[in-house]
Amino acid sequence: MYHTHMHESLISVTSTVSVSDASYAYARLTRRDDSDSSSSSASSTKNSKSAECTGSKQQCQLPTDSSHSTSVTVGVAVAVPVGVIIIVLAVILCIVYRRSKKEAEEDNDPDFEGDSEFLPTMKDYSPGINHLYSSDSQQDFMEKTLQQPPSDPFVGSMHSSKYNVRSATPPAIGRSWYVDPFQLPQESNDSNSLRDFAMRVQEDGLGGYKVAAESRNASQTSLHPDNFSNCTPIRASSRFQESESFRSHGSPIHNNQLSRGSATEGANKQFTFPNEDNDSSSVSEEAEVLNESNESASNDAFEFELDNSSEKTHERNLRFGKDDDNYELQDIREAEHMNDRSSSKSQDDDYYVSLLSPNEEEDIKRMKSIYQVYLDRAKTMKKEEDKADNANDISQEENRVDNIVQNPLPSIKINNNDNIDNNEVPEAKHLVKEALPLNNTNLAEYGPEMAQSQKQYPVQDTLTVNDTEAAPSNRIASSIYSEAIQPLNYQDQYQQQEQSPVYNGHTQYPGNGYSGNPQQQGYTAQFVQNPQWYGVPTPQQQQHNHPQTLETIGELPTPAYLAQSASSHSLTSFKRPNKQQLLQLQTARLNGTALNPVDHPEMFYSPTNDAYYAPQQQGQYMKFNENGAVPSPYQLRQSVVMTNPSDLTAKPSYKPAGSFRSVSATNSRNNSLTTQNNIYLQQQQQQLYNSRVSGILEETDVVQPPSVGGILPHSGSQDDLRKQLGSSHNYTVN
């Protein structure tokens, strides 16, 4: 039984061990399967990756840094635009450099005549001719002489004389001078000046174009004796004279300028070769015509002075090279060469003088009138004719002065010992007037000039008349300020002494000057004192010696210094009326019965300068004549109605910009004396002040109270300024 039990326990142990071994083996098998599956999956993945890459290891290996592609992209995006911009700028700079270089070469071009001239290009010249005088705009001289001989280039040109000198060439040799004036410039290797281009105009039917084109040529070929003295003929060399086409086209050369026409040549030949085989009648006619032309040439409006350079003292050779043939044009001044020139003259050269047509004469007169107004240099230059005219004028003035000295006008003698103060007018003392008889001569025999002179220098009332001093010592009547102070005597009754001269018992100066028989113009001045009594001082009681003695009016200060200034000044001086006014005048102003000078000018201002009106106490006005006296400053002021504007019209009220209402007529007169002394109007204004137009604007913001005289005082100290600013309408106004 024990053996059986042991056997059963052994079997159970064995079974237990076997179960544990089986579980362990299963776990190992399971773990092995997992490792095999993982290894197989890894190998399969590796195999799949290795299957995708078909290159070398370096090719299949991915780069560790991926910024390579980014840098390439950024570099291309930046470098390409920058390179394109640099290339474009280089092209532009190259073009600008070439253009500037070309302009610099054109600026240094000797053919350049100026910015105001248009230089057209003409046809090409002959290849063998070298133009040596392109800088003087004369490079086409040989072309005109050799290729295109001018048959009649100056037809209708404005010459100084009445006649025109022309050269007639046979049709076989010369051809017509015809060029289209509206010809467009053509492309060429060389360019001519505007003067040469404008000279080539059509002969007929151009009108103003012809006048404008040939004005310069006409001025250079004017028939003036001075021009002929500065001209010398040209003798060509033997080879130059052999050609038949060159015989009749020699032209003169000025001292410093080549002539472009044959008109001057014809004139020179007329003066240089008087011994030609011509009829006596034709010679005499030509001489008469030339004399007339010389006389008329002195008044030439188109005459220009030809500059005489230093080349006048030596000979100048002009050479035009063409291969081996050198044509020489020598400026020779010996008489023997002039004889050779006259002997070599061709029979085909027939020079004559012809009259101008009426149209040409009319054009000449028109151009002369325009030239004399705008371009005449004679007005700014001294000439012998002007000296002669001045001498004649001086002689006439001397004769006139002699006549005046024989009959001297009354002059003014001023006492230099007068005590003149800067601000005060000295009181007049008892001045003794001496009645000096004037020369009782008949002024009519010296004509109206003497009478006019006597009118311009009348006798002064309060000044001593002297018949020994010269007339120019008088003061001109148009002067506002007189040289001497007219003495006045201020008394309680405003007594004024006025001396009116009596001339032979009647008045000699009735307003406009002399009247009646001129035989009565001789007179003897006698001064009689006529004291007049006034209730109101006359305006002439304010006399000043000189403008400097008046009040100094300062310039308007800048706004920055306006606060520190004592008062606000302007260039216009406003002065309040004097407080010492008569009660009657104040009453008349308050009642509105004072006369307005604008409404009644005849009561205050006389139609002439020799009378004025003075107000009286009874309201009447009396006229007092100052016969023959120089107008006083107050009379000159009255002649232009220099009246204080505040005395003529009522002062307007202050109306700021942007007002919401229209000020009534009563409020527009709030600063006048009538409004200030009228209780009814003041009550109306007070009602308007208290009433509100709207909730935005107050009446006191629009209308200035009557008690406020002005915005700022025009004179006074800083205290006055503060007082004025403190009494504004924004505060309580009494």
Curated annotation (Swiss-Prot):
Disulfide bonds: none
Transmembrane intervals: 72-96
Compositionally biased intervals (Low complexity): 37-51, 280-299
Compartment annotation: Membrane
GO cellular component terms listed in the entry, alphabetical order: cell periphery; cellular bud neck; cellular bud tip; incipient cellular bud site; membrane
Protein family per UniProt: Belongs to the SKG6/TOS2 family.
Protein name in the entry: Protein SKG6
Origin species: Saccharomyces cerevisiae (strain ATCC 204508 / S288c)
